[in-house]
Design a protein with these regions (language model features):
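Active-site proximal loop and beta-alpha junction motif in alpha/beta enzyme cores
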Residues: 1-74, 80-275
Length: 275
């Protein structure tokens, strides 16, 4: 056991305490997978990260990401929040204005030169969502099929079962699942309009919560899908967490064929943890 630098960060919100909380252990070298999982479970946050020495010469650090139930290849708010913590702890990127994170999906760049930090969205695989699964989701959510405009199955590390509705108001009107099961993992809704350009909800998070406050990896997958299919053009402001009292804001843009996902982070706890 040793004392390690620790921070807790609120991510993807302009207002501290209104985003998605993240635990970050900055001195993560030497911990076993089980030790990291045990600590992540103990924090009871959606994700806990461990910053370690990189194995790639091009990376500034390696990031291990754990949910309450297991390790994740990639996640969005851990990417931005861990980067903010690393920089606040004195980290200096090898390339000016760009932090390079090594994680389960490879190297992810986090640009520091814009109005807010933004990461390059990982490649997203797009497949059809099985019609029978759409019916199961609609039945579980009491969702009328005539509200649906498109569906898709997206994968950028996590897998997302996406249902696009006509309007943001339709998204906000849906009640969360009353029953939980693996068939409803990663169910996401989106609709145009509302307080931002797009309203998003993650009703099947990997954590024990009924709804995730703000999900960077989901919004990255949605942005890749929508920009690549021509559904979105220009910068977009995405709201998430509205129904559970959060002010989540994700900023998406596509520049020269690369999708960027940005957001603000606030360090609310800075200290040490004994692990």
């Amino acid at each position: 056991m040793q004392s390690r630098r620790f921070m807790q960060v609120d991510v993807f919100t302009p207002t501290p305490t209104q985003g998605n909380g993240l635990a970050v252990v900055l001195d993560g070298d030497g911990l076993s997978d089980q030790q990291m999982q045990d600590f992540a479970t103990w924090t009871n946050l959606a994700e806990t990260t461990f910053i370690q020495s990189p194995t790639s010469p091009d990376a500034d650090y390696r990031l291990r990401i754990f949910s309450l139930s297991g390790e994740m290849l990639f996640a969005g708010h851990p990417t931005l929040g861990s980067c903010a913590a690393w920089l606040a702890a004195g980290g200096a990127p090898k390339r000016f204005g760009c932090v390079v994170q090594e994680c389960g999906v490879g190297l992810v760049e986090i640009d520091q030169t814009g109005p807010m930090p933004a990461f390059t969205a990982p490649a997203t695989a797009v497949d059809a969502l099985d019609p029978e699964q759409v019916e199961r989701i609609c039945a579980a959510l009491a969702l009328s099929r005539d509200r649906i405009t498109r569906t898709a199955r997206l994968n950028n590390g996590p897998t997302w079962q996406v249902i696009e509705l006509q309007r943001a108001a339709d998204v906000l009107a849906v009640k969360p699942f009353t029953t939980r099961g693996p068939e409803f993992r990663g169910v996401a809704l989106l609709g145009q309009g509302g307080e931002a350009d797009v309203e998003v909800r993650n009703l099947g998070p990997a954590s024990s919560m009924s709804e995730d406050p703000i999900t960077g990896s989901l919004n990255a997958a949605l942005a890749c899908w929508k920009y690549e299919t021509g559904g979105w053009t220009g910068p977009k402001v995405i709201a998430q967490g509205t129904c559970i009292g959060r002010t989540g804001r994700v900023y998406a843009d596509c520049r020269e064929g690369t999708v960027w996902i940005g957001g603000q982070s606030h360090i609310l706890i800075d200290g040490t943890v004994t692990l």
